[in-house]
Amino acid sequence: MAAELLRASEAARRLGVPTKEVLRLVRDRRIRYVMVNGIAHVPDDALEEYRARAS
């Protein structure tokens, strides 16, 4: 099954951090993302990967 692609605001809500923090993670390539029509989307399974590395 394909991972759900989340906009930065939804990824931030699920991580419990500000949207700017998710955008910073994308910019610094500290979280996996996919570009769709020029907009970065975070796969929902990348949130768990990030949580595992951040702890």
Segments the model singles out, each with a brief description of its role:
Residues M1, V26, M35-N37:
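Short, solvent-exposed coil/turn segments
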Residues M1-T19:
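Polyanion-binding surface elements
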Residues T19-K20, D44:
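The DNA-contacting recognition helix of HTH DNA-binding domains
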Residues E21, L25, Y50:
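Residues in the recognition helix of alpha-helical DNA-binding motifs
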Residues A12, L25-V26:
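Hydrophobic alpha-helix position signal
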Residues L5-E10, R32-S55:
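Short helix-start
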Residues R29:
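Glycine-centered, phosphate/nucleic-acid-interacting loop/turn motifs that mediate DNA/RNA or nucleotide
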